[in-house]
């Protein structure tokens, strides 16, 4: 799960670079949306990875 969180975080950073710097000005709106989407997914995966890890180590 933590690996997926890292992957989605990297995707969010790449989307931010394209969206916020104006490199792809035609796709800036889409890139900003993807940044928010993948950032939220990365945070969810991070939380799930941490909670799943604590459940496994408690037993």
Swiss-Prot record:
Name under which the protein is recorded: UPF0391 membrane protein Geob_0344
Species, as recorded: Geotalea daltonii (strain DSM 22248 / JCM 15807 / FRC-32)
Subcellular location as annotated: Cell membrane
Organism classification: Bacteria, Pseudomonadati, Thermodesulfobacteriota, Desulfuromonadia, Geobacterales
Keywords of the record: Cell membrane, Membrane, Transmembrane, Transmembrane helix
Keyword Transferase: no
Membrane topology value: Multi-pass membrane protein
Membrane-crossing segments per the record: 4-24, 33-53
Gene Ontology CC terms: plasma membrane
Domain of life of the source: Bacteria
Family the entry assigns: Belongs to the UPF0391 family.
NCBIfam families linked: PRK13682.1-1 (NF010226), PRK13682.1-4 (NF010229)
InterPro entries assigned to the protein according to its UniProt record, in alphabetical order: DUF1328
Pfam families given in the database record: DUF1328
